[in-house]
Structures are given as structure tokens and as C-alpha cells.
């Protein structure tokens, strides 16, 4: 099972709240067999502890440490929100990465996302990508 599959990418989405964005990221992972139904509630638990907004229009919601048992396969969902969504404290997210990692694979996933998002040009490419293949290509450049 691929960590980032085409089915895990939702382009050009419109959501009305941070909660809706997190739910969509989690539901995408559920629908494609990466996590159990309970994972979304663990994502919200994690968000209550501290915001998963990373700056530069990027948010990376994920489950709590206890949520590891809900992860069936390591994976990423990418929700592209070109118009942005209020993500708390005046921050706007335009790309939301839902992540789930078996064992410690989430650290590798986070590392790849951090490398990609350290370049402002890559963030612009993520926000403006017109196809799932375009987004996957950005990730393949890092690996």
C-alpha cells in the first residue's frame, strides 16, 4: 500500500472550518483503508493538546500517541484548500496533510513534509496543483 496514493488527494476543496478540514483529512484515510473509524476522534484530541498548524499555510493534523493502534497502514491524505480555511489564532491553512504512521514511520512522513514545505516555491506548487499527479511529483522529488 502506497503512503501517498492518488485516492488520498482531494484537490480544490472548500471547507468552512478547521474541524471540517481535519475531518476530511481523517475520513480520506479511513475511506482508503489506512486507519480505523476511531482515528478522527484521536486527531481532534491531538488538536486540543496543541495546534497542528505549521505556518506557511500548512497544517498537519494527526492522531495522539495512543492512536497508533488505530493505524492499519502508514499513509498521508492531502486536502488542498486554495481559498484557505481559518485554522485558529488568525492562521489560514491552504494545504492540510492528514498523516498516520505505523511504528515510527510518521517521523519519516513528517520529515518529508518538512523538507518539501521548507521551500516557499513548493508550498505554492502544492496550493496551485491542478492534478493528483502534480502533487505526487512534488513528493517524489524529495525521495
From Swiss-Prot:
Q: What is its main location?
A: cytoplasm
| The gene coding this protein | mtlF
Task: List the SUPFAM superfamilies.
Answer: Phoshotransferase/anion transport protein
Record carries keyword rRNA-binding: no
Entry-annotated residues carrying Phosphoserine: 74
* Catalytic residues identified in the record: 62
The organism is Bacillus subtilis (strain 168)
Q: List the PANTHER family.
A: MANNITOL PERMEASE IIC COMPONENT, PTS SYSTEM MANNITOL-SPECIFIC EIICBA COMPONENT
Q: Name one Pfam family in it.
A: PTS_EIIA_2
Location within or outside the cell: Cytoplasm
Mind listing the UniProt keywords for this protein, alphabetically?
Answer: Cytoplasm, Kinase, Phosphoprotein, Phosphotransferase system, Sugar transport, Transferase, Transport
Question: Cross-referenced InterPro entries, in alphabetical order?
Answer: PTrfase/Anion_transptr (IPR016152), PTS_EIIA_type-2_dom (IPR002178), Sugar_PTS (IPR050893)
Task: Tell me the domain comment.
Answer: The PTS EIIA type-2 domain is phosphorylated by phospho-HPr on a histidyl residue. Then, it transfers the phosphoryl group to the PTS EIIB type-2 domain.
Purpose? The phosphoenolpyruvate-dependent sugar phosphotransferase system (sugar PTS), a major carbohydrate active transport system, catalyzes the phosphorylation of incoming sugar substrates concomitantly with their translocation across the cell membrane. The enzyme II CmtAB PTS system is involved in D-mannitol transport.
Q: Which residues form the signal peptide?
A: none
- GO: which molecular function terms? kinase activity; protein-phosphocysteine-sugar phosphotransferase activity
One of the GO BP terms on file:
phosphoenolpyruvate-dependent sugar phosphotransferase system
Domain named PTS EIIA type-2: which ranges?
A: 2-142
Domain of life assignment: Bacteria
Q: Which named protein is this?
A: Mannitol-specific phosphotransferase enzyme IIA component
Q: Name one GO cellular component term.
A: cytoplasm
Tell me where in this chain the PTM Phosphohistidine is found. 62
